[in-house]
Amino acid sequence: MHAIIRRYEGVETTRMNEVAGKVKETLVPQLRELPGFSGYYLIEASNGVLSSVGLFDTSNQAGKSKDIVTKWISDESFTSVIPNPPVITSGEVVVQTDGVPALV
């Protein structure tokens, strides 16, 4: 599994709920259509910071999400709300747990 983490700084704090709603309504459905898509999480940090975690089977699949997200920001007219490009970290997931204890 491959994770791609995006950190957006300088997000307009008064529109965080609007962004989150649009992510759920219009971005997530697009990401779900990508081959290898496993999950997506949007985290509202503080002080105008949004982070997202996307999970995919391969790094190539995760890389394709970058174009979709960039186009989505423009299509939704969020370039003024999310004015800065994200800091992106990506790599292979080396430890994973689902929180369910193992059966003995």
Report residues per predicted region.
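Short S/T/G/P-rich N-terminal loop/turn motif that feeds into the first structured element of a domain
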Residues: 1-51, 57-71, 78-104
